[in-house]
Amino acid sequence: MSKEIRYGKDAKQSLLKGVDLLANTVKITLGPKGRNVVLDKGYGSPLITNDGVSIAKEIELKDPYENMGAKLLYEVASKTNDVAGDGTTTATLLAQSIIHKGFKAVDNGANPVLVREGILRAGKEVSQKLLEKSRPVETSEDIENVASISASSREIGKIIAEAMDKVSKNGVISVDESKGFETELEVVEGMQYDKGYISPYFVSDRETMTVELENPHVLVTDQKISTIQDILPILEQVVKANKPLLIIADDIENEVTSTLILNKLRGTFNVVATKAPGFGDNQKDMLNDIAILTGATFYAKDLQMKLQEIKLEDLGLVQKAVVKKDTTTLIGGHGTKDAIDKRILEIEAQINSSTSDYDKKRLQERLAKLAGGVAIIKVGAATEAELKEKKLRIEDALNATKAAILEGIVAGGGSVLVDIQTELKETLKDSHIDIYKGILAVLDSLSEPLYQIAENAGFDGQDILTEQRKQNKNYGFDAKEGKWVNMLKEGIIDPTKVTRNAILNASSIGALMITSEAAVVEIKDKDQNIPTQPMY
């Protein structure tokens, strides 16, 4: 395959154009009065959303050089979404600004390697300042405020706060579709563990990369399944019962996985396999929890229990199992209330007698999963397009809330970044001018979110920015109401983790891009664009 290469200014301008096309599409969604973007998915109804990463994911540009720039910027949104679950638009906007300012410094003669050093240093300093300004989430009102700001809806904020009240901050909250028009909260006994399917070939929904099993049997063991013969007797019984099967085992050989996938694809039976969560004694405890919750017999290797002897009545049952890449959620276990209550008392006793903070934390997590259950937010809407959009907003709000619980909250609306900008411009300096130019590329970009929020709300961004620099601590611009308020008191807050990851990821990709001096792409043959005729 032939390649085309562009150097220097030509390469940079093409990459920048791609960066701008993506960022300019995403940034119109920022803030309480941000707009939506309509995405053609190629099937079904279009998706109307203001979720930065969902928009960035759909953008494919015709020019391969511009497309590279867009894809590099998408990495910022994607990484921020993976780690913090929200803040993708802010991250994209910050990255665009840092890249522009970094390239400008290099074009004016600065050494790109030294500018890169300054960008990375400033990114870390801003991140540290955010942690210093952070305050912990203490009340249900804080949770409601974080969720409301993320989803741009007080109603959604209240539902998420209520869900966290019912299953605790460490509980599991999932988002599902409702058959009605109203969005409701339902709490079901269940648990989630941090292991997903062992192969993507088990997936039934390719768009979300998940698999859902309705009323499946559950096999629980800490043994390794080495051959298909180990579980053949129970597989035959499951096929006769005509029920799906979830296998939770310490490990599963490739040969066994291949056989299970082949039979699933052929429609012989519906099965999903996951590895057991945890390790060592903690793994045994967690598997015992799952067995008690589902009503299964835990086939432990320490007790010399043979997998070939498993009977149908040894399997557990759940109303629903949702298996993703990294997590499995069990909803509506058929374990007896007495057995679950007894197990909860055992764990509570262990917490009281434990002297290790690490052990206490692990035990509390297990207790939350057993006692709290799963809260399901059932999203209702009048149309499919509204349902998809609402579901995305709720998922973002949920992620933002979890991030706030982990690292706390800061004043929102972009005000905290402008405050940090003012502080660091006084203290963060470097004797080498090129490194300092890199530092300034980051610091000067910190005002972009506030500027864009104001512009999207119909105000003059520069005027609002000038006024923000005169404000007292924690004061900022409420773009929804068009007035200056105490952001923390009014509940206009951002999760520290979200803002911190946005700046770290933006400075990381910005630092990489400004050191790029050439771009290489494949030259597509004209024949490649002609679709091949089907063979009959």
From Swiss-Prot:
One of its GO terms (biological process) is protein refolding. GO terms for molecular function: ATP binding; ATP-dependent protein folding chaperone; isomerase activity; unfolded protein binding. SUPFAM superfamilies: GroEL apical domain-like (SSF52029), GroEL equatorial domain-like (SSF48592), GroEL-intermediate domain like (SSF54849). It is an enzyme of class 5 (isomerase). ATP binds at residues 29-32, 86-90, 413, 494. It catalyses: ATP + H2O + a folded polypeptide = ADP + phosphate + an unfolded polypeptide. InterPro entries: Cpn60/GroEL, Cpn60/GroEL/TCP-1, GroEL-like_apical_dom_sf, GROEL-like_equatorial_sf, TCP-1-like_intermed_sf. Belongs to the chaperonin (HSP60) family. Forms a cylinder of 14 subunits composed of two heptameric rings stacked back-to-back. Interacts with the co-chaperonin GroES. NCBIfam families: GroEL, PRK00013.1, PRK12849.1, PRK12850.1, PRK12851.1. Together with its co-chaperonin GroES, plays an essential role in assisting protein folding. The GroEL-GroES system forms a nano-cage that allows encapsulation of the non-native substrate proteins and provides a physical environment optimized to promote and accelerate protein folding. This is Chaperonin GroEL. The lineage of its organism: Bacteria, Bacillati, Mycoplasmatota, Mollicutes, Acholeplasmatales.
